[in-house]
Amino acid sequence: MINDGIIATKLGLQGIPEMAEIIIIERDLALLDSIKCRYHISQLSSAKSVEIIKNKKENIKFSCGVSINNLSLNENDIGDFKTFLKLSPPLRTEEDRISLVKGLSDGIIDVIVSDHKPEDEEQKRLTFAQAETGASGIETLLSLSLEHYHNGSVKLETIIKALTSNPAKILKVNKGTLSVGSDADFCIVDLNKPWIVKQENLQSKSKNTSVENKKLQGKVMNTFVKGEELFKL
């Protein structure tokens, strides 16, 4: 999948317009205004969607998320048919990416998701049209999110909430905080530890990362689940 724009035209690929996303969001929010049920938009990808949600949240209660891929990359990163960047929703323009980051910073967007969709290499080493969509994202989610803290675009507290307490509230699970009575699921992070994404160092069985060879800052050092340490770097 690729954004319907200049890059798709240059590569001779059929793109997906932002209107495909906008129409669904506007339709669902119109229904939500009448039905009054719980509603979550899993992954936004366009500036126009952020604008719509900002206006609708003044009168309607719902939540929304964004993929870390769409916060960190844009359609130009696809370059010459990089199939590891064939994602759903597609990467859009740099202007869209900046609007998504601002939407997160302003509290319009509630959660950041990994959009973890591992695929074996054979399914990605095909033509762009034939390749499967998706990227392995769990192991790079935190570090890519912290990029926006390190460059000053999003407060650390906002990033932490978007990765922990906000998803827990949406799913109504007893997690995401260190308050008394909550499940002791947490991690210890070195905010400044530098590392480089290398396929051979990823724990995931599938290595289809969207950010191979990218230099990142911030790393999980320990992970605890229900108080038990399950991972240590």
Where are the model-predicted features located?
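C-terminal cap of metal-dependent C-N hydrolases
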Residues: T127-Q130, D183-L233
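Residue-level signal for inorganic ion chemistry
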Residues: Y39, G65, D115, S145, ...
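Short, glycine-/Ser/Thr-/acidic-enriched flexible segments
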Residues: S46, N69, K117-E119, K193-P194, ...
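Short capping/connector residues at structural and topological boundaries
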Residues: E18, N76, T83, P90-R92, ...
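His/Asp/Glu-enriched, well-ordered alpha-helical/loop segment
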Residues: K10-K36, S105-I112, K117-L191
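Residue-level signal for pocket-adjacent positions within structured domains
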Residues: A8-L11, V66, K82, K86, ...
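Histidine/acidic residue-rich metal-binding segments in metalloenzymes
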Residues: M1-I112
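Glycine/Thr-rich phosphate-binding loops of Rossmann-like dinucleotide-binding domains
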Residues: V50, S72, D120-E122, C187, ...
